[in-house]
């Protein structure tokens, strides 16, 4: 099949297996060049491991610390008529390379929210690794099926209290618009917390703890985002923000649970990056296009892989073994460079100046669009997109 990108809204409906593999190879090469992580983890479970920060965490653990990794994700393999999801190809590429390099890597494809997958992971850990010493929680799902009742709960990308009106980009037409988003109801806010809050992270730690597979000194981290004043109304002050605050609650509860093991639980607040999740949030494509340009000019720009390598080396696994630096809510702040006063002041000054006519000139919107399609394996150097490729990529992946 010859595959070209087809974009509908904030989703690319096609994926390119060769491009996805190149993406993973680039992350692996970056990590190898950085060198080994002192005191790094050796047996790592990544929940939500197929893309974004989760995949970068798996790469950092495996290639920065020679760790055995188990990845959990919910992805679609290809059919004869349709390519698989990008996360499927990413995971296949990682596992292929890891095994070629003599690293233990196994994956389980299924609903991370279910009891069944937790039981399957416990079984696999007991069988192959005995225990684990790190758990990365990086699930970005818009919908959650409650494991006890089967009820399906949906999250909302909405403000709280009043209608949100802001400058934004219509990414289909590449024009500046005024985006209007109606406020969430109380039920929508509660549902968003149920889907995107910390409850499932807690359930994972409980299931693994009860099974006795958590090692002494275990570290677990969940990824979050706070953003800036420009994005707070739709994000931190909106329904999503309430879910992220619930992650903080869960972090404290898990920390207490891990006390007998001298374990640690943290929320790590990351910088804004181009992901399918962030592209769905009104205002984020414009903000990201601006802040990327400013951070690149200042030599501060990082993608997912750079962020996670810095998280591991400067916070979670320091050479001297000391604890991470945290804010008042015990969060690790990897958004520190993005939130620098000079960066944010430049964003505030640039924001009102953006028009359709100067969008490509004043921001990194061209690069934003390119990075977006790269998530799906397109616009990657060294890939022949006119070549016929086999979309069916199989690997030894357990499914639940």
Swiss-Prot record:
One Pfam family it belongs to: Eno-Rase_NADH_b
UniProt entry keywords in alphabetical sequence: Fatty acid biosynthesis, Fatty acid metabolism, Lipid biosynthesis, Lipid metabolism, NAD, Oxidoreductase
UniProt site (Plays an important role in discriminating NADH against NADPH): 75
Positions that bind NAD(+): 74-75, 111-112, 139-140, 244, 273-275
HAMAP family (UniProt xref): FabV_reductase
Protein role: Involved in the final reduction of the elongation cycle of fatty acid synthesis (FAS II). Catalyzes the reduction of a carbon-carbon double bond in an enoyl moiety that is covalently linked to an acyl carrier protein (ACP).
Assembly and interaction partners: Monomer.
Name of the protein: Enoyl-[acyl-carrier-protein] reductase [NADH]
Protein species of origin: Psychromonas ingrahamii (strain DSM 17664 / CCUG 51855 / 37)
């Amino acid at each position: 099949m010859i595959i070209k990108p087809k974009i509908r809204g904030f989703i690319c409906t096609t994926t390119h297996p060769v491009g996805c593999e190149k993406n993973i190879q680039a992350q692996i090469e970056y990590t190898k060049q950085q060198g080994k992580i002192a005191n790094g983890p050796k047996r790592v479970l990544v929940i939500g491991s197929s893309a974004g920060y989760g995949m970068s965490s798996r790469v950092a653990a495996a290639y920065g610390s020679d760790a055995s990794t188990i990845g959990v994700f919910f992805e679609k393999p290809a059919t004869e008529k349709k390519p698989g999801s990008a996360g499927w190809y990413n995971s296949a590429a990682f596992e292929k390379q890891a095994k070629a390099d003599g690293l233990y890597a196994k994956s389980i494809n299924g609903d991370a929210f279910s009891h069944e997958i937790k039981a399957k992971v416990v079984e696999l850990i007991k069988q192959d690794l005995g225990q684990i010493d790190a758990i990365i929680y990086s699930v970005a799902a818009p919908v959650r099926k409650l494991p006890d009742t089967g009820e399906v709960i949906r999250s909302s990308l909405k403000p709280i209290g009043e209608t949100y009106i802001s400058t934004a980009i219509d990414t289909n037409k590449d024009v500046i618009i005024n985006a209007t988003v109606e406020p969430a109801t109380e039920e929508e806010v509660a549902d968003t917390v149920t889907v995107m809050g910390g409850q499932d992270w807690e359930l994972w730690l409980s299931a693994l703890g009860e099974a006795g597979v958590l090692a002494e000194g275990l570290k677990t981290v969940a990824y979050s985002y706070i953003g800036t004043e420009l994005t707070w109304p739709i994000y931190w002050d909106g329904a999503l923000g309430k879910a992220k605050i619930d992650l903080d609650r869960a972090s404290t509860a898990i920390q207490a649970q891990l006390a007998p093991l001298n374990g640690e639980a943290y929320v790590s607040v990351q910088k804004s990056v181009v992901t399918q999740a962030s592209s769905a949030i009104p205002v984020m494509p414009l903000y990201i296009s601006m802040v990327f340009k400013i951070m690149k000019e200042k030599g501060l720009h990082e993608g997912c892989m750079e962020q996670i390598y810095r998280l591991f080396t400067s916070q979670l696994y320091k050479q001297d073994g000391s604890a991470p630096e945290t804010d008042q809510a015990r969060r690790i702040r990897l958004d520190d460079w993005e939130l620098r006063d000079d960066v944010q002041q430049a964003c505030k000054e640039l924001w009102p100046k953006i028009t359709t006519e100067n969008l490509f000139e004043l921001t990194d919107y061209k690069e934003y669009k390119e990075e977006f399609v790269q998530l799906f394996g397109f616009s990657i150097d060294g890939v022949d997109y006119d070549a016929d490729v086999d979309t069916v990529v199989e690997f030894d992946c357990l499914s639940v």
